[in-house]
Amino acid sequence: MPQVLLAEKALICGAEGLDTINHAALIVRDGKIEAIGREGELELPGDAVIQDLGDRWIMPGMVDLHSHVAGSGHNDMIFQCNPGLRASANVTPHNESLKLGMLAGVTTVLYIPGSGTNMGGQGVLLKTGPGSYEESLVRFPGSLKVAQGDNPKRWGYGMQRTMMNHHIRVTLRKGKAYAKRWEAYERGESERPERHLHLDIFRDLEAKRTQISTHTQYYQVVLASLNILTGEFGFDAYIDHGSFDSWPLSYLAEELGVAAILGPREVLWPRANTYPKDGRVEGSAWGFQKEGHPRIGFNTDAPVVPQEELPLQSAMGVRYGFDNTHFAAARGVTIVPAEVAGIDHLVGSLAAGKDADILVVTGDPSDPRSGVEMVWIEGEVVADVRGERGRDREGVRQW
């Protein structure tokens, strides 16, 4: 049976087009958004169950592209580069941390290995609501996790950035050659290559079916990430865990089509070993936006910042200069990460055909005074705190 939600305002969060619809009506059928429009102008199904949400707003569920809380959050530091390891083997669906994130409106996460090595392995995109792994799965592989900077220095005997960049290049070179051999075989131009499970991820990367999510920060480190991953090897990659003073590279990131997903540190402070700031405290998102970068999002690095504080990350961006005139902060936790991860056909905005992952909020989610009152995932109510109700698909209380 279709459902209709009537709300004071709908935050569309699309990549382009309308920011909002006042006095909105949204139709949900079979777990998908069927239509959205202005109440009185949108034809409603005669058999629909109508929920009038009064002065509340509706918006799409939020997406976090840097999370470690869908399982243990650790990584096996066997080698400096471990492209074959899979975080999907370590998932505990709808665990307590994911529940808290869900209650705050985070409906999709990229669960990835940690940053103890330059290449921690393969991430997995998951819904945060109740259900099995198979029911939660959005896409595997969700990404190849690459980490640059200080954390992987601690691996083994210790190494500096030059050697780490060498390791990354060698692995990418092997992986790209492996993917090319398989492409030649599939075109009927060569014999079947020997299968190497630890390099299979590069077939997905070469075919643009997934991306490299890159734990990268500081100017020099982000410069290496941009030049190596996308500039030299042509893989789709994005800045993930973007922090500190990387925004002066916005021009290069934009030129290479690399998005900036920022956090868990949203603020830059004056330091001796960086460019002069004249005593200013600067926001990372402000810097990228000031330079004209079109794709800026936010992440938590949960549990470093709790999963439920993803909207607070965007609020900090706004507090430190990010222009939110057209709800760019809401887009930064919805459609921007969805597009970057290649799942915007499923989630990220209120549009016909997408999963009915919908939030009922009391106002702009980048305003810390706003709260989430209801959460739908794929057309099912998974949280309703208006009357402190919360039940999973079997009717069991969630918290």
Label each PLM-derived region with a short phrase:
Residues 69-72, 114-120, 219-223, 244-248, ...:
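Active-site environment of divalent metal-dependent phosphoester hydrolases
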Residues 102-236:
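Polyanionic/metal-chelating signatures
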Residues 86-87, 182-279, 297, 323, ...:
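Active-site core of metal-dependent hydrolases
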Residues 9, 74, 81-85, 211, ...:
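His/Asp/Glu-enriched, well-ordered alpha-helical/loop segment
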